[in-house]
């Protein structure tokens, strides 16, 4: 039990450290409310990406594929094999290429990261259209304006800097 509490404390401290590092990186360029909405939206995106990956990985491992990693499969395979039942179970769907971990891997080379993120957020919200979760997912990322010039400099530079410095494991 003590080990679990210590691990949670360590994770919380790491999260606080990352949030302060992000704040230092964009301090002055964004007012507090916009900053909070942006960071919380990105953190939520990371959470649901990790959550859906673990959901698929656990199911595949239970079925006997101990080396399966959803993040490593093609979008086409995900569409065919996973999308049909996922929105019913999870309330949303994210393609492997749209997962936070894959976006981070490619952030340094992606000159369109800000618009790609906006499209990913729209796709996540759109994945619930026609399902019971539609109202809960609709507008979820509307406060995360990745094209806003309030982030200072160029948006792509700010977002790329955020991912490169603050989102690696």
Where are the predicted features?
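Non-catalytic, mostly N-terminal accessory regions of nucleic-acid modification and defense proteins
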Residues: 1-169
